Amino acid sequence: MVHICRLFVVMGMLMFLSVQFASSQHWSHGWYPGGKREIDVYDPSEVSEEIKLCNAGKCSFLIPQGRNILKTILLDALTRDFQKRK
């Protein structure tokens, strides 16, 4: 009986120490607990050309894609491969 009590005490102490030395969650830069993010001031000079085209109504990603998704994926992969070889 004494051995069982000592075993529980040792296990409890080990569990307590392991919790104390375990690494806790790291909050990355700009993130706060609860999933809230730091809001940066918007700089209009950082607007990309794609966004400017979208504001003009010429978004390439808004063009409806064909029904054959596999064909689109393969064509994109081939295009990337071709561009890498250039």
Swiss-Prot record:
Olfactory bulbs, hypothalamus and telencephalon, midbrain and posterior brain areas. Keywords: Amidation, Cleavage on pair of basic residues, Hormone, Pyrrolidone carboxylic acid, Secreted, Signal. It is found in: Secreted. The modification Glycine amide is found at G34. GO terms for cellular component: extracellular space. One of its GO terms (molecular function) is gonadotropin hormone-releasing hormone activity. Transmembrane segments: none annotated. The modification Pyrrolidone carboxylic acid is found at Q25. Residues 1-24 form the signal peptide. Belongs to the GnRH family. Stimulates the secretion of gonadotropins. PANTHER family: GONADOLIBERIN, PROGONADOLIBERIN. This is Progonadoliberin IIB. It comes from Carassius auratus (Goldfish).
